[in-house]
Amino acid sequence: MERRRITSAARRSYISSGEMMVGGLAPGRRLGPGTRLSLARMPPPLPTRVDFSLAGALNAGFKETRASERAEMMELNDRFASYIEKVRFLEQQNKALAAELNQLRAKEPTKLADVYQAELRELRLRLDQLTANSARLEVERDNLAQDLGTVRQKLQDETNLRLEAENNLAAYRQEADEATLARLDLERKTESLEEEIRFLRKIHEEEVRELQEQLARQQVHVELDMAKPDLTAALKEIRTQYEAMASSNMHEAEEWYRSKFADLTDAAARNAELLRQAKHEANDYRRQLQSLTCDLESLRGTNESLERQMREQEERHAREAASYQEALARLEEEGQSLKDEMARHLQEYQDLLNVKLALDIEIATYRKLLEGEENRITIPVQTFSNLQIRETSLDTKSVSEGHLKRNIVVKTVEMRDGEVIKESKQEHKDVM
């Protein structure tokens, strides 16, 4: 009976942070005590999935870059060839000119040095003139800037004076209006006093007439009742008294009217003088305002020209800033493309490093398994047809201090013509 010992072990393991992946065990799942693992011939690890769309895009970008570089290289080659031809042509011309110069020198001495010295003196003189003109223009510019500051200060002062004059004019106008209102009030009072005087005169005349009528009636009554006594003296005395009283009242009213009229006349004269002064000052302020307005217009024109020059300077600076921004954007794009390419290379390097780490871990695991085996694997080539399945159970113990203790049980099955003849188990301890 032919005996064949079949011992095979194949597994994949990945250890990270105290976790282990064996065979088809999901990543991140821990092995508990008494876990039974079936170790058999496993297929080789599948390659990492590749994003072909990204690879195609990178390949297309690489092709475009290579095409642009090739076109640029061809253009540079053409330019270099044309440059070489031009250099050769200039060298030939230089040789011809050198030969002609030698011929001229051989014929007779020239005065080129004197001609060049004269031209150099002229150029130096022009340079000195331009330097002097530049200095003069700078001085004029500084003077104009100083004059501009002075004019601006003067404009501010004149503006303040104009505002003050306008305020004073408004105050004078208000005073003139008040004087006009006072004059109108005095005129109304004068009219009311004249009406009162006329009313008093009318009342006085009526009183005199009534008194005369009363005297006449009393005289008639006395003449009828008495035997015509002589009342002429009494009537004359009474008439004299009333006339004196009326005359004194009239005189007092006229005096009061005259005093009131004189007061009103003086007030009107004073108000008229104030109004005349206000009008004169208003005319002066108006003339000053016109002159200040002319100065303001001239300064406004100067200010507009300076603002126009400033806008032109700002526009030129804006264009330069825009060009600098565009150059900066291009540089940032190039930097970003370089960063992306570097990130891609780093990702590729990280993937390769992960693959290397996984391979190192698998190699270490295989080495541990092979060291734990007592018997070597001897499988003849012709017995692969009778090869069945070999089961291996793997028991794990507790994990302590970052090391994983495992009991590896190797089960050996002897088969013949598809029938199991003998089974044996061997237990090995392994610490990782």
Swiss-Prot record:
Region (Coil 2B): 257-377
Location of Citrulline modifications: R30, R36, R270, R406, R416
Region (Linker 1): 105-115
Location of region: Linker 2: 253-256
Renumbered residue ranges of the record's region Coil 2A: 231-252
GO biological process: intermediate filament organization; regulation of chaperone-mediated autophagy
Omega-N-methylarginine: residues carrying this PTM: R12
A GO molecular-function descriptor: structural constituent of cytoskeleton
Protein name: Glial fibrillary acidic protein
Gene field: GFAP
